[in-house]
Amino acid sequence: ETGGKIEILIEQVLDDQNALAMIKSSKKINMDLKIILSNNYVVQILERRENLFLIQLNQGSFHELMELNGHVPLPPYINRPDEIDDIKRYQTVFAKNKGAIAAPTAGLHFSEADFELFHRNNINYTFITLHVGSGTFQPVKVKDIDQHIMHTEQFEITNETKIKIELAKKNGGRIIAIGTTVLRAL
């Protein structure tokens, strides 16, 4: 509506038309602001929820909108626009479910060949789903770490994965978490 620049980082898709998002704007963000995007998509800001905004889409779904207009949210230390190769470069080879706004970086170095090697050497592994949120980008801003408010994270651990982990522990095996987000989830 105002012609200003705006960046929307979808934190969580609630349903096809509603999502929670971080919004950066060159101008003040007012409630009920309508953001007009390409292909006749209009996003309306409904309310503020702490550091996020509840936004509503006028048509289609947020997943469709992200496929058409979305960009890979690169880590802040990478100071360049995203490229088409970033879609694969910043995603783990074992990613299956949508929902994270950033890759769980500890797993980025694994390749299909690594998992083939694990299999050939009878090294058991299993997966959990991490929905890494925007809090992963938030710095600690307080001197006393006990005063830092930690962000929440969503994850999914299937019953099959739970059984594999319990069996490994029962048999004296080691459980090695790849990354701090996995460690917190376990």
Can you describe what each PLM-predicted range is?
Residues 1-186:
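Surface-exposed, charge/polar-rich loops and edge strands
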